[in-house]
Amino acid sequence: MANKNDYFSLRNEHTNDKIDELLADLPYFCADFFYGIANNTSALTRLNYAYDLRIFFTYLSEIKKIPVEEMSLSLLDELKAVDIERFLNYLSNYKLNGKKLSCNERGKARKLASIRAMYRYFFNHDMIKANVASKIDTPKLHEKEIIRLDGDEVEQILNLAESDAAFSGKKQAYHNKLRVRDHAILSLFLGTGIRISELVGLNVDDFDFDNNSFVVTRKGGNRTILYFNDEVKDALYEWL
């Protein structure tokens, strides 16, 4: 587990660098949008916006026969709702960098949300006349099946972390050194259901063993208290 300040700072720094790279592939006016929302969105949210908008403007470049670098903000006023709906339909089967790709309803909904956020920003700042993106219905999302491990599967994973049957020589010595750590991390991960990104951002100071609780940093930066059972506590105690 990493020092949480270093982990999140480095992650945000890397994410912001990637956003700057993607801005080079977007129309010049998109920089105003990204700088304008920087104080009320996370870096990961902005990165997703950048990826989605790159696909959107690449599509418009092909359809309108206008290089992305020559697009002006007036283009957003020229587009009709049907133009964005055609883009969503295009996402069912499209190419990016020579690769064939396809978006399901959830992917289309995310890209529409990115387009809406951009339109909303420029409309609220009186930089465009209309917000046509707000007129488009969100693609219907089908309920996503949640796949869970049963008790036996969880036990098998934890037993595998402790077993040295698959190792020999130097690998076994290395495994023996990290066995307790791996078991503790997997116990916490499987016992609480936190995300991997939340797990790697934890620090020893985040844990309160008197109350079997810990503080996790959620998506968006919110801090939440979660609880673990005695089995997880014992595994963490053995390691820490």
Where are the predicted features?
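Conserved catalytic core of the tyrosine transesterase superfamily
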Residues: 1-240
